[in-house]
Amino acid sequence: MKTISFLVIVISAGILAGIVHGMLNIILVEPYLDNAIGIENQRLFAEGQAKDTPQFWQQFTDYRIWQKQGSIVAGAMLGASTGALFGLVFAYSRKSLPSDNDIKKALILASIMWAVLYFIPFLKYPANPPTVGEPDTIAFRASTYALFVALSGFGAVGFAFLYKKMKNRKFLVFVGYAGFMGIMFVIMPPNPDPIGTSMDLVNGFRIISAVTMTTYWIVNGVILGWMWKKVKPDAVPVA
């Protein structure tokens, strides 16, 4: 394995996919965030926690501009971290993945990691706009979500090793993983915060968030597969 070439392509693929994710968030997700934050601001005014003044709106506008500008950077950071993990798993499992085409191989793995690290946790703890959730529960919600992602990820790794060792009835591995995650769904606590805002806003935010994250994994898979095909970091040098 050519270490430098490997690191360059996996990090580059992740960052590029992350930038696409950040741009999509600005275009598609930010309007929902604006609506949700607008509702939250009105609640603050009604409860006397903030005053509807020009100074408030100036500070709010400056903060939102800073947030939106940071979406690209946040996307790139997400891409660099998850892209590195994706690249490591791809390098390890590439020969075991079906197809002779590196792009198809990468897309297959991307779909698996999307399901394990995003979609299955999303079913238990779907994304909510800022107007949903109390400040006091942020740490609890973040920790339970991270734990569920870890359980899903490590569970998938464990059952993947079983899949390689089993010669017959490999479908039982998928049944086992599904059963394991079903138990985790029951054991793990639910989201503690009730939804007190429009479900149209919440569902729209969840759908668009899922679209942007799904796009991220697809783009990461395509770019990594294409770069791997071109660079061939695992090629053995000819003496």
At which residue positions do the language-model features occur?
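Juxtamembrane/disordered regions of integral membrane proteins
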Residues: M1-A239
